[in-house]
Amino acid sequence: MKVHEYQAKEILRRYGVPTPRGIVVDNSEEARRAATELGGRVVVKAQIHAGGRGKGGGVKLAKDADEAAELTQKMLGMTLITHQTGPEGRVVGKVLIEEALNIDKELYLGITLDRRLGMNVIMASAQGGMDIEEVAERDPNAIHREPVDGVLGVQPFQARQVAYALGLEGDAFKKCVDFVQKLMRAYIETDAALAEINPLLVTKEGDVLALDCKMSFDDNAMFRHKDVMAMRDFNEEDPLEVEASKFGLNYIKLDGNVGCMVNGAGLAMATMDIAKLAGGEPANFLDVGGGASAEQVKNAFRIILSDKNVKAILINIFGGIMRGDRIAEGVVSASREVGLPVPVVVRLEGTNVELGKEILAKSGLPLITADGMWDAAQKVVAAAKGHQ
């Protein structure tokens, strides 16, 4: 789960992580009052769940309260397009008015899980204020990585290593060490999946602050954090993904035209790969799980069909806990309820597979059956091309 910049900073402040003073607004008059309260010279920042806002025109410097109000009026309601939003962009509903600071250095600091190491890793670079992916590609050695033991936590010497890597000294060095330790505590205690400070700002006065902050959280841990869960902004999420989550379905919308319904994340990814190999483009990732009911299958079917880009659907089920007859009943029920506006290819294997195939055969529906994954992939790609 993602949160907005102003929400991430609110979380960080609870842990003593320094951030600039800021006020979130949703109209120009509030922006005028906020800018006046913050001293007049402020930064106006569009709040969307995506990076690259500056390049897209979503971050502007205002010299006084009147200009802040004018910029806010222009930003609110605009569709902001960045390299992370895709061509459809995101509509701006809130704006953060933040005090302007005297910048000396812009650095990068981030914490995330390194699955290869099985440890959280602190990443730091003196090349802040830009996409860290670009830095990693251009100059991998410019990023310092500090793995953190899950039991011991971040040690003082590790925080000092990070400050050294950022080239800091004097008061800024000491403040950075404190910043790193507090950021790690915030990351761990909120079950975050990412805490990214870009840029980490060093002011001319020697202060160290989070000028921008991006945080995301482990969905499976949110039952422990009702306060963070309350920050969820459904307007920033794909409506189909929100709908799927209500039924316990793991759904991620993609840009292709081959809808996929699969049980198990590994098989779902393999199904997407083989559809791509056969010349198709997956329209989604959808894992119905190991114990889905016929009702869940029906809802999964309906959600896939809600995507107007879908030209054919591949249902690929290996029955272990999930029985083939239950899937078949769900497919038949969903097909009769919503109709079959696109071709549907079904591949069943495992528990009760023969019973499942029998249910499909007796349904009288124009379902296309397949004997293996490659056969299914070829059939669904051909069906999608024929249904353009």
What residue spans do the PLM features occupy?
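Short internal beta-strands
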Residues: 341-350
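Catalytic core of bacterial c-di-GMP phosphodiesterases, primarily the EAL and HD-GYP domains
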Residues: 320
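Short amphipathic alpha-helix used as the core "switch/output" element in two-component signaling
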Residues: 332-333
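ATP-dependent carboxylate/acyl-activation modules
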Residues: 1-197, 201-315, 325-327, 336, ...
